[in-house]
Amino acid sequence: MKPIVQVSLDLTDIKEAMEMAHTAMRAGVDWLEAGTPFILAEGLHGVRALRKEFPNIPVVADLKTMDGGYLEAQMMAKAGATHVVVMARAHPETIKVVVQAGKDCGVTVMGDNLGCEDMVAGARMLEDLGCDMVIHHIGYDERRGIAAAGKVPPNPLDQLKAVVDAVGVPVQAVGGLSLEQAIASPSYGAPLVVIGAPLAIDADSFSRGAGNVEEVLRKICEKVHAYGDVAITPRKN
């Protein structure tokens, strides 16, 4: 699979989100993500706006579905999302119906292992239940709370290779990665590179970050795309 650069639009203002999306497209980004704060602020209107503005670009709707899975996935698909996200900590039946909605509506289902006691087992379970891709995710509050207690928070790269080896679907690492670490994800076998805070988004205010975002994104895209194909190896058991 060719490596993909995805920009997470974790913004609460639709004008800022659209400006960031246009910046990302000029820089060579492949996918746009309607981040959770953006969806909470703008709802289906925000997803529809992204689809209208960028008719040929994949749009990930990061709703973090925990229940009502079929309806939520269906609604996002009808609004124009090409990818939806369901949480591993949801009931297995929720994951199953999101997967079914993905098949019925023609969207890709990404399963997120945020909060799993065993992150590798959570990733395997998501694949077993039919998810097309796995998000290996260390949460913002988890990282911040552990750091505030004077401890070193976990990093997605700590277990990324183990997650990649455990599943036979594409993997994305999310949560607290530096730009250099995010760019290195394909070297672990994870072709889906997501960029959000701290480059594009101020993680505390959920507003656009400062600096020459377009130029930095362009360099990131060049480095990630230079990896070439990343092998996705089917599971052996």
Predicted regions and their residues:
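Catalytic beta/alpha-barrel core
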Residues: 10, 31-39, 58-66, 82-93, ...
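Alpha-helix-loop-beta-strand connector modules within alpha/beta enzyme cores
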Residues: 40-64, 97-115, 151-173, 211-234
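Catalytic cores of alpha/beta
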Residues: 20, 68-79, 117-129, 166-169, ...
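Glycine-enriched alpha-helix->loop->beta-strand junction motifs that scaffold or abut catalytic
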Residues: 26-30, 53-57, 78-83, 103-108, ...
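Active-site rim beta-loop-alpha module in soluble metabolic enzymes
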Residues: 115-166
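Conserved N-terminal beta1-alpha1 strand-loop-helix module at the mouth
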Residues: 1-70, 126, 208-219
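Glycine-rich phosphate-binding active-site loops on the catalytic face of alpha/beta enzymes
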Residues: 81-93, 134-146, 188-217
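General structural feature for long, well-ordered alpha-helical segments within catalytic domains
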Residues: 16, 20, 28, 42-46, ...
